A protein has these predicted regions:
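ALDH superfamily catalytic-core signature
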Residues: 37-38, 78-221
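Rossmann-like NAD(P) dinucleotide-binding subdomain of oxidoreductase/dehydrogenase enzymes
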Residues: 1-114
Length: 221
């Protein structure tokens, strides 16, 4: 998200200041180091791309600063409302990419193998923490059972563990707050009459000491 927004701005001759999520600062530093090398090789002034690490207070400061004509923000809907209000209050511009509820529609003539591969990767890749993570499947009734059974079998084969181990499919959630949200979501499914067809749960024991490794679950509504 940072790359495609800033690249357009740079091409148009603008300077960019980036504040990554306080939960993933190393990713921001790595990206900044890469672009710094590219700029140096092409004699672009160092300050054209700047990085500021910090918590939400840094974001608030940037939203209110009239020297920043356009603020691009990616995150939750709650965050987006705050940014939009602050930037609009100084007649600035905002570009928001906010949380959603992404779905895959599965029609009767869908390729079952590709459907399962795409759905599983979309749902469990990066432990379901991408803004583009698959959260729902809308399946035609004529193939519903076939797709459901295939997904259940696929989930049984998932390996959960250290993401630095390439044999694992699913890594940890970002922190214990995310684990709480995960548990609350599963509880809400049951409370609202849904059916859990692939059981979730927090993993414990050797390799799972952080308490942030969870089992991907599937709910039927």
């Amino acid at each position: 998200v940072w790359a495609w927004n800033t690249a357009l701005a740079w091409v148009c001759g603008d300077v960019c200041v980036w504040k990554p999520s306080e939960k993933t600062p190393l990713c921001g530093i790595a990206c900044q180091n890469i672009i710094a090398e590219v700029f140096k090789e092409n004699n672009v002034p160092e300050g054209v791309s700047c990085l500021i690490n910090g918590d939400y207070k840094v974001g608030e400061f940037m939203s209110k600063d009239s020297r920043i004509p356009l603020v691009s923000a990616t995150g939750s809907t709650r965050m987006g409302k705050i940014v939009a209000s602050e930037v609009a209050g100084r007649l600035g511009k905002s570009l928001l990419e906010l949380g959603g509820n992404n779905a895959i529609i599965v029609s009767p003539d869908s390729d079952l193998k590709m459907t399962v591969i795409g759905s599983v990767f979309g749902a469990v890749g990066t432990a379901g923490q991408r803004c583009t993570s698959t959260r729902r499947l809308i399946i035609h009734e004529t193939i519903y059972d076939k797709v459901k059974n295939a997904l259940v079998e696929a989930y049984k084969q998932l390996k959960i563990g250290n993401p630095l181990d390439e044999s694992n499919h699913v890594g940890p959630l970002i922190d214990t707050l995310a684990v709480d949200s995960y548990n609350n979501a599963l509880n809400k499914v049951v409370e609202e009459g849904g059916k859990i067809i692939v059981e979730g749960g927090v993993l414990s024991g050797n390799g799972y000491e952080s308490g942030c490794y969870v089992k991907p679950a599937i709910a039927e509504a």
